[in-house]
Amino acid sequence: MAVVFLLGPGMWDKARRPTADPAPMQIRRNIARGLQSRGHEVILMEDDPDRPEEDYIQKFDRLLRCKVTDVVLYWPPLAKMQTTYDELILLCDRRALLEKASIRLWALHHSTVATITREEFKVLESGNRSRYLTAVARLGLRPLEWEDEEDLAEQVRLLSTEL
């Protein structure tokens, strides 16, 4: 079974979407439960206790090196994504580790936020970060696109069989 490092936003971007339930963090927890129910271990940074004198990047590295087999990015529309962008860039800087450990990358993204191919990661939302994220696509990012909650649940189910 897989060890999944599940990345993604924790909250909505209040400037673009009024606060609504469930928050992206809750949806990530639901995704985690779905994967766990199929026998996979899931790591969420928010749930792992901070360690004394460990900064955010050190925590990210420690968790990534924790027998992770797959990194899954959850990306809904209108979410606050800055920290998630940073995490994706951190993955690019860890290319050697990803290759050595054969860690696969997945993007569970809404159809309105990005188009992803092997050679391009094009952000469709405002605040375009495409030129930086194309390097992530070139790491072998596997896109899993969804349109609505039912479609998201189906993509999670299909993902759980691929892990």
Residue ranges of predicted features:
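Conserved catalytic or regulatory cores that recognize and/or transform ribose-phosphate-containing ligands
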Residues: M1-L163
